[in-house]
């Protein structure tokens, strides 16, 4: 079972929201540790320069999940829709599925459908240190 699959919102919404908010909270509280886990001279030069993502660790959830969390915070009703359809008003063409993901890659920590991507690890670096730190900061909550 993927605990970060938004399909859980239908059957087990508290389970999904618990894991999602735990990860977001951990990155918010311990972003500096996560940033230190990917630090190297080459990566520090790359991040925030002429290339995305920036050196500041931020989380991008997408518009749908952002609205859902705001509704939970404000105790309002909200129905999460994972994807949207666009009708081009051309009878011979099907409806298009709109992508709500971060395509321009401007955030270093992104929710992409049913998982998080940490995009700040350098190409030549081993992701093990960052994954270990991420697991530790989430477990620390």
Can you annotate each of these PLM segments?
Residues 1-141:
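Active-site capping/gating regions of soluble enzymes
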